[in-house]
Amino acid sequence: MAKEIKFSENARHSLLKGVDKLADTVKTTLGPKGRNVVLEKSYGAPDITNDGVTIAKSIELENHFENMGAKLVSEAAQKTNDIAGDGTTTATVLTQAIVREGMKNVTAGANPVGIRRGIETATKAAVDELHKISHKVSTKDEIAQVASVSSASTEVGNLIADAMEKVGHDGVITIEESKGIDTELSVVEGMQFDRGYLSQYMVTDNDKMEADLDNPYILITDKKISNIQDILPLLQEIVQQGKSLLIIADDVDGEALPTLVLNKIRGTFNVVAVKAPGFGDRRKAMLEDIAILTGGTVISSDLGLELKDTKIDQLGKAGKVTVTKDSTTIVEGAGSKEAIAERVDQIKKQIADTTSDFDREKLQERLAKLAGGVAVIKVGAATETELKERKYRIEDALNATRAAVEEGYVAGGGTALVDVMKSIQGTVKGDSEDAETGVKIVMKALGAPVRQIAENAGKDGAVILDHLEHEDPEVGYNAATNKWENMVKAGIIDPTKVTRSALQNAASIAALLLTTEAVVADAPEDDKNQAPAAPNPGMGMGM
């Protein structure tokens, strides 16, 4: 296909138009008085959202050159979302501010490579200063504050704080759609996996149709148990001790299953058999997790272990096990805290190294099950459209809260970026005149989020920013109440990781845009090159 090429000023101008179209759409959502954007879908009702990355991803411009500019800004938002889970609108506003100011200087004759060096120098200094002024998250109230600011809802903030308190900071918190209109939290403690009993005759509670085992032994194996003789010595020892048994195996079939059921019905001993969770390598990893959690050993040919040689001290133990037809929950595993902590660190490293979203999700699930449980926030709303919008907001709030736990928090409402600007202005220098220009561009851009929040609240952004530059650290403009106050004390806080990621990604994409000298895009198809239309049979085709 033929290509169209634009150079220097023409190229940058086309990219800037795309940047502005996307950023002007996204930035209307910033702050407590930001508006919503309606997104058309190919079918069904349109989506209504104020989630920056969702809006950015949905924008596709007709002009190829402008679309490239828009897609680059969208990438800054997407990267921020991937790293911190929030801050996408801030990243978009910062990108636009740096690009606009940079383009003016490049047009006036400044060298874009020098400007880029200055942008990188100033961004590094700003990030270092952000870390210096960051507060660590230590209480449940602080977690609730972060979540409340991100979701614009105290109710959601408290729900997320409750969930984190119950399952720990590493625990998995999933967000599901509720069938009702209320948003509520439920928590599954301990390790749960989606495999139920192999026979309903194993239940101990006929009303609930579930099997409860108190202080059971747990046999963990990746083998199939078909011959009862393989585990008979083990069963005899367990019966002598008057204990119950949970069997987690590849499968239990042949004569083994009916023999176990018969002994259960006769009251010889309490036993429940379930299939091992997962498939392939993931199954092996999950069985190893269960073994570490319960202090047992996986009886596997990979380790040279056979069922018939299994000793009772190779079995795991737990305080309580509950098995339904669909799931097994192990609570109070008897594994050593050191072994569990070591396994948790190992999984965290795998999460950091993986490039697959699916693998990351599965690893996080395993991490949560080892770290203490799974919390489920069920989102309710009156309509499908409202439900989707609430779900987006709660997901953002959850991501923001995790980010705050990781790197701490700073004053919200764009105040921290202006505080950083005040601290480093005059101390950060470029190594040339053009680099110095790059430093000044970043300094000016740091005030862009505050300006936009004020404008979305119907105020003059320049006036608010000027006032803020003369205020004490952490004192900012609360757009929700139209007051000047200490943002941290008022509970208006942003995760440091979110603010940092937004600035770093904005500076990175903006610097690339400014140093662009040529843009190549598909040439628009000419009408004369298109195939002629088929003749209409109803026009002059009669005999």
Curated annotation (Swiss-Prot):
It is an enzyme of class 5 (isomerase). ATP binds at T29, L30, G31, P32, D86, G87, T88, T89, T90, G413, N478, A479, A480, D494. SUPFAM superfamilies: GroEL apical domain-like, GroEL equatorial domain-like. GO terms for biological process: aggregation of unicellular organisms; positive regulation of interleukin-8 production; protein refolding. One of its GO terms (cellular component) is cell surface. Its EC number is 5.6.1.7. GO terms for molecular function: ATP binding; ATP-dependent protein folding chaperone; host cell surface binding; isomerase activity; unfolded protein binding. It is found in: Cytoplasm. It comes from the Bacteria. Keywords: ATP-binding, Chaperone, Cytoplasm, Isomerase, Nucleotide-binding. Signal peptide: none annotated. PROSITE patterns: CHAPERONINS_CPN60. CDD domains: GroEL. It catalyses: ATP + H2O + a folded polypeptide = ADP + phosphate + an unfolded polypeptide. Together with its co-chaperonin GroES, plays an essential role in assisting protein folding. The GroEL-GroES system forms a nano-cage that allows encapsulation of the non-native substrate proteins and provides a physical environment optimized to promote and accelerate protein folding. Forms a cylinder of 14 subunits composed of two heptameric rings stacked back-to-back. Interacts with the co-chaperonin GroES. PANTHER family: 60 KDA HEAT SHOCK PROTEIN, MITOCHONDRIAL (PTHR45633). Belongs to the chaperonin (HSP60) family. This is Chaperonin GroEL. The gene is groEL.
